[in-house]
Amino acid sequence: MKRDIISVYDMKDDLEDIIELSIKLKKDRTIKFSEKKILAMIFEKPSTRTRNSLEVAMEQLNGHAIYLNPNDMQIGRGETIADTARVLSRFVDIISYRAFNHDDVVELARHATVPVLNALDNLEHPMQIVADFMTVYEKKHRLKGLKLAYIGDGNNMANSLLLGSSILGVDISIACPKGFEPNKEILRQAREISLKTGNKIEITDDPRIAVEASDIIYTDVWVSMGEENERENKERIFMPYQVNEDLTENANRDYIFMHCLPAHRGLEVTAGVIDGIHSVVFDEAENRIYSEKGIIYKLLS
């Protein structure tokens, strides 16, 4: 039976196993598919890390990745997502989809007969979460009991971090302006999981409260792709949520700073923080390769 990863929630039973597999694949690059596998990558949004890491991941696994831009496909001229899913399922072994609309990813997965990966949409960014917590484990040598502070917009990254933290037993405190909180249904799912794993979940509008005694500080862009018309207003609202040297004084001395990138220095984070000794953002970016290898190998082997 085929398995999709549309949400971090889809990994609630084996996220830790996937992280362990990703670390193993990073250490041993001789592990590959015995038969060539093909990935179709549909990108409605631009990409640096996701596209290139998926291509490298497939190459290292004895596979191949095909880049598909909707403007070059019949889907851009009115062909349905359902028909696109059915056709691609005859051609390839697995599909990744970076979409503006979460419902479109769900629709593709519903009609595809091969696994579908959410490569980022307006609600979640599940593959990033595997890379993130893989990186945390490499740096901290544990996950359960750590505290992660997320500062900024309650966007797709905040949603996915909520779920990932709850599954792995990582305490999470999210600081965002009122009206920009994470998705309510995802927060409900995270709280439900936390009843089993025991992690603490906090939503606040005070970044200092969130960062207090944290092991990980995470931020993301304030203006997501497709929200460019909101830039001026959001930058004004979010400036008090900038991760800067003053704010990080409230964290543990050995905290690590994370960002899924691309970053805007001087907005959500200062250059001093993202380019400083606590930053692990480029290790985090590199681990996109190995985390995606782990996910794909898990689904196809």
From Swiss-Prot:
Residue positions binding L-ornithine: 156, 220, 224-225
- InterPro entries in the record: Asp/Orn_carbamoyltranf_P-bd, Asp/Orn_carbamoylTrfase, Asp/Orn_carbamoylTrfase_sf, Asp_carbamoyltransf_Asp/Orn-bd, Orn/put_carbamltrans, OTCase_ArgI
Keywords on record: Amino-acid biosynthesis, Arginine biosynthesis, Cytoplasm, Transferase
Which annotated residues bind carbamoyl phosphate?
A: 47-50, 74, 98, 125-128, 260-261, 288
Q: One biological-process term from Gene Ontology?
A: citrulline biosynthetic process
Q: Which domain of life is it from?
A: Archaea
Chief localization class?
cytoplasm
EC no.?
A: 2.1.3.3
Pathway given in the UniProt record: Amino-acid biosynthesis; L-arginine biosynthesis; L-arginine from L-ornithine and carbamoyl phosphate: step 1/3
Q: Where in the cell is it found?
A: Cytoplasm
Reactions it catalyzes: carbamoyl phosphate + L-ornithine = L-citrulline + phosphate + H(+)
Enzyme class per UniProt: transferase
Q: Please give an example of a GO cellular component term from this record.
A: cytoplasm
The molecular function terms of the Gene Ontology recorded here are: amino acid binding; ornithine carbamoyltransferase activity
TM helices/strands, residue ranges: none
Q: Which family does it belong to?
A: Belongs to the aspartate/ornithine carbamoyltransferase superfamily. OTCase family.
Q: What does this protein do?
A: Reversibly catalyzes the transfer of the carbamoyl group from carbamoyl phosphate (CP) to the N(epsilon) atom of ornithine (ORN) to produce L-citrulline.
Put simply, this protein is called Ornithine carbamoyltransferase
Q: Which organism is it from?
A: Picrophilus torridus (strain ATCC 700027 / DSM 9790 / JCM 10055 / NBRC 100828 / KAW 2/3)
